[in-house]
Design a protein with these regions (language model features):
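Positively biased amphipathic helices and basic secretion/translocation or surface-docking motifs
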Residues: 5-52
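Single-pass transmembrane signal-anchor helices and their membrane-water interface zones
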Residues: 27-41, 51-80
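Juxtamembrane extracytoplasmic segments of single-/few-pass membrane proteins
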Residues: 70-131
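Subset of Sec-pathway N-terminal targeting signals
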Residues: 85, 125-242, 575-612
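Long, acidic serine/threonine- and proline-rich intrinsically disordered regions
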Residues: 125-129, 158-161, 165, 174-180, ...
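Beta-strand secondary-structure signal
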Residues: 168, 234-236, 253-255, 437-439, ...
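Acidic, Ser/Thr- and Gly-enriched intrinsically disordered low-complexity segments
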Residues: 184-189, 193, 197-202, 210-211, ...
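Exposed acidic/Ser/Thr-rich ligand/metal-binding surfaces
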Residues: 217-436, 495-514, 591, 601-612
């Protein structure tokens, strides 16, 4: 045994003593060495003893390092607590300033990221420290695995080169309530891709003219200079669907497909409350089934009658969360029940309530899409209600609802759950028209360029407008669809046109296009199909000759759109600011019977404070 090995043994003994091990368990260094050399000499394979010795030493050292590492996780997590969407909705971010460690969260500098940015999916998970009672001993570490589909913001297009703008209807509202969760519960700005302007606009109601007599839709136009860029004109297009009395709504066959996995534990009481609200509105001729998927797929109610609300509610109250997610198998069982209780001419619909984390079974997007599209052809639609945070899969739920001819909402609190379930049962979950498409042709003589604000996920090729086989959005009974365009008028200064359209040389191999001298500004076309039958689509055409006047509708919508531009840090936001839009919006509250507009001001102020 050489001097180096002797020194190693001395160091090892000292380290073991420093671990506060009882002294009587160890011999003196001299006795230990003597015994060591004696045993080593007797071993035919002395390397076994060395291995055992060093494994023991390594275990002792690693245990100490692990303790230090675990503590460092808490402290390193604090500075990023409000910089990513991993902030957990069920933990309030109001920390006690007296808490020595956690009080630093509210004062910690934000990570050097663009406003609303998010690490790309597939990057290392971000740890976030959340504490419900501002005590270190109760702190919990969560990982951010939320997913949002990337949005490439619409750009200005030249009417001379691209006079047609085509997109599908979208009456979803999930983005708005999800962003509210970030601002009010997470104390964080949302990731940019979580902000979909069309869902912000459609979260609110507007004073649109309603269809008369046997009309299915009305189209409303308004305009005003863009508050954030006066050289641009804002054009509002508001579509109003026919309202139907609740008594005249068709019978429903609802199949609730509920995720009861462990990730749903914190939000499950709200889920039960939301279902109870909907159960109260069931009519005697409505049917409801309940399927849960977690550790296993369970049918809790197989075709319960709306006349027996007590039985339905008892089944709802007995639900609980816990287990591993198996969404694919659950969806198969839900469609099986939907077919079993199918109502011809009725509202047959799967109602999915989940955080979107499908781990087992039909999990790939392609398999889910094929299944949902196939069942859609059988007049069984799918609506999605998202809940939860930290592991929320917005991209997957949005995709399923779009492919399933259904609507998509996010339930961030019990109040929203009650509101959504009440509204859904009076129209939104009852499809009035399917494959609703819009196409606007702008006159190059009047409009030099245009930009659609939002609807990035609903854009369509111009040729698809007249193709009835191309799927598009659905509009519920009495519902509204609102869209905003930014316009660069043909008589705008040349420097303004060049700013938004660029400086392109004249074409060399083709003659200039002939521009009509018509006094028309644009032609708006609305194409849709009736919910029943396979009759050809219907077409409605509206011609606008001049910029219409403004009302409270566009003034409110402009504030909502500006809010989304600020949250996304849009390259087209111009002089947009939270303060400016909040002042404008405060003058357009109107009756605000549901309190949504007043709450909007609260969200704007929260975002403004977070930005500072």
């Amino acid at each position: 045994m050489n001097n180096t090995q002797n020194n190693d043994i001395d160091k090892l003994l000292e380290q073991m003593k420093e671990r506060s091990c009882p002294e009587q368990e160890y011999k003196t260094p001299e006795a230990f060495k003597a015994e060591f050399f004696e045993k080593a000499a007797q071993q035919k394979k002395p390397n076994r003893f060395f291995k055992a010795l060093f494994i023991t030493a390594a275990s002792v050292l690693i245990s100490g390092i692990a303790g230090v590492w675990a503590l460092s996780l808490y402290t390193s997590a604090v500075p990023i607590a409000c910089s990513t969407p991993a902030v957990i909705a069920d933990n309030k971010m109001a920390f006690d300033e007296s808490a020595s460690l956690l009080s630093r969260v509210s004062k910690a500098p934000r990570a050097s990221m663009a406003p609303g940015s998010i690490p790309p999916v597939g990057s290392a998970p971000q740890m976030v420290l959340c504490d419900s009672d501002a005590r270190f001993s109760h702190a919990r570490i969560r990982y951010n695995t939320e997913e949002y589909k990337y949005l490439q913001e619409n750009k200005f297009l030249s009417t001379a080169l691209s006079p047609l703008s085509t997109f599908g209807a979208d009456a979803d509202t999930a983005s708005y309530s999800n962003v509210r969760r970030f601002l009010l519960q997470g104390n964080c700005l949302p990731p940019a891709d979580a902000v979909r302007t069309e869902e912000f606009l459609n979260y609110f109601s507007y004073d649109y003219k309603k269809p008369r007599d046997n009309g299915d839709f009305t189209v409303n136009f308004e305009s005003m200079p863009a508050p954030w860029a006066p050289e641009r004109q804002l054009l509002l297009i508001g579509v109003q669907a026919k309202e139907v009395d609740k008594k005249e709504l068709p019978p429903s066959n609802f199949v609730f497909l509920i995720d009861d996995s462990g990730s749903m534990y914190d939000v499950f009481p709200m889920v039960r409350e939301a279902m109870t609200v909907l159960a109260d509105q069931l009519r005697p001729h409505d049917w409801i089934s309940i399927v849960t998927y977690g550790g296993s797929v369970t049918v809790h109610l197989d075709g319960g009658s709306g006349a027996d609300k007590r039985k339905v509610k008892s089944k709802i109250n007995a639900l609980s969360a816990g287990g591993f997610t198996s969404g694919g198998a659950g969806i198969l069982e839900a469609y099986k029940l939907a077919h079993k209780h199918f109502i011809k001419g009725g509202n047959n619909r799967i109602v999915l309530i989940t955080d979107g984390d499908f781990n087992v079974g039909v999990s790939s997007e392609s398999e889910l899409v094929k299944l949902v599209e196939k069942e859609r052809q059988s007049a069984i639609y799918l609506s999605a209600f998202g809940v939860g945070s930290g592991n929320y899969k917005d991209n997957k739920l949005k995709m399923l609802a779009n492919k399933g001819n259904g609507n998509y909402s996010y339930l961030d609190n019990p109040r929203e759950a009650r509101r959504v379930m009440t509204n859904e049962m009076t129209g939104k979950m009852f499809t009035f028209a399917k494959d609703v498409k819009f196409q606007i042709e702008f006159s190059p003589a009047r409009v030099a360029a245009y930009r659609l604000i939002g609807y990035e996920l609903r854009k369509m090729a111009a040729r698809d407008f007249n193709d009835d086989t191309k799927d598009s959005g659905e509009v519920g009974m009495g519902h509204q669809v609102t869209a905003l365009y930014e316009l660069i008028m043909a008589d705008a200064p040349s420097q303004v046109k060049e700013k938004y359209m660029g400086n392109v040389d004249k074409l060399k191999y083709q003659s200039a296009r002939t521009v009509s001298k018509s006094d028309e500004l644009l032609t708006f076309k609305l194409r849709y199909q009736q919910i029943e039958g396979k009759a050809p689509s219907r077409l409605k055409t509206f011609v606008l000759k001049k910029l219409p006047e403004a009302s409270g509708n566009i003034r409110w919508a402009s504030a909502v759109a500006e809010f989304s531009l600020c949250l996304r840090n849009s390259e087209y936001k111009g002089t947009a600011s939270y303060e400016a839009l909040r002042k404008r919006a405060s003058k357009e509250l109107g009756k605000d019977e549901d309190g949504k507009r007043a709450e909007f001001l609260t969200l704007v102020k929260a975002a403004e404070d977070l930005q500072d």
